[in-house]
């Protein structure tokens, strides 16, 4: 069985842990507890191939900036996450997460993921954003950012409703099993 290491990064509170818990246990966690580091594992079949998917949850908070890269070596694929209802987390993909990931892992495939899809059409959430003269991130905006950072895919999901959830991890596995031909074959990560 092939083992694939997937590291999940993004701002604090964008839903990285909920994403992983919902996917691996089919249950949505009730309370928010900021992560330092956690690992999850799932044995899955993708395109008739058995895969052991190692999922590495990381801390989004700045306090862990020096610790986080310790989880990067030998990463096969990154999920860079932002919340569809947090424009600041969307901006931080380009300003923070993408440059950091690329610095440590220049050729590892990236999937850009918009989380909290269930809240994009939520009236209360939209109103709160409007009060701050903000709006949820649209699918075309996500797609544009994915192109900018040269991610292999742009996906959106909801850990709460599980809409699009399985697709995220299937596509992460496919990014490793069926790499895009323009990318170099060497995918190992190294710390400098």
Curated annotation (Swiss-Prot):
Regulated by guanine nucleotide exchange factors (GEFs) which promote the exchange of bound GDP for free GTP, GTPase activating proteins (GAPs) which increase the GTP hydrolysis activity, and GDP dissociation inhibitors which inhibit the dissociation of the nucleotide from the GTPase. Coiled coil: none annotated. GO terms for molecular function: GTP binding; GTPase activity. It is found in: Cytoplasm; Membrane. The modification Cysteine methyl ester is found at residue 189. It is a lipid-anchor. Its EC number is 3.6.5.2. The modification N6-acetyllysine is found at residue 147. PROSITE patterns: RHO. A lipid is attached at residue 189 (S-geranylgeranyl cysteine). GTP binds at residues 10-17, 57-61, 115-118. It catalyses: GTP + H2O = GDP + phosphate + H(+). It holds the Pfam family Ras. It is an enzyme of class 3 (hydrolase). Keywords: Acetylation, Cytoplasm, GTP-binding, Hydrolase, Lipoprotein, Membrane, Methylation, Nucleotide-binding, Prenylation. Residues 190-192 form a propeptide. It comes from the Eukaryota. GO terms for cellular component: cytoplasm; membrane. Belongs to the small GTPase superfamily. Rho family. Interacts with DOCK2, which may activate it. Interacts with S100A8 and calprotectin (S100A8/9). Found in a complex with SH3RF1, MAP3K7/TAK1, MAP2K7/MKK7, MAPK8IP1/JIP1, MAPK8/JNK1 and MAPK9/JNK2. Interacts with PAK1. Component of the phagocyte NADPH oxidase complex composed of an obligatory core heterodimer formed by the membrane proteins CYBA and CYBB and the cytosolic regulatory subunits NCF1/p47-phox, NCF2/p67-phox, NCF4/p40-phox and the small GTPase RAC1 or RAC2. Plasma membrane-associated small GTPase which cycles between an active GTP-bound and inactive GDP-bound state. In its active state, binds to a variety of effector proteins to regulate cellular responses, such as secretory processes, phagocytose of apoptotic cells and epithelial cell polarization. Regulatory subunit of the phagocyte NADPH oxidase complex that mediates the transfer of electrons from cytosolic NADPH to O2 to produce the superoxide anion (O2(-)). This is Ras-related C3 botulinum toxin substrate 2.
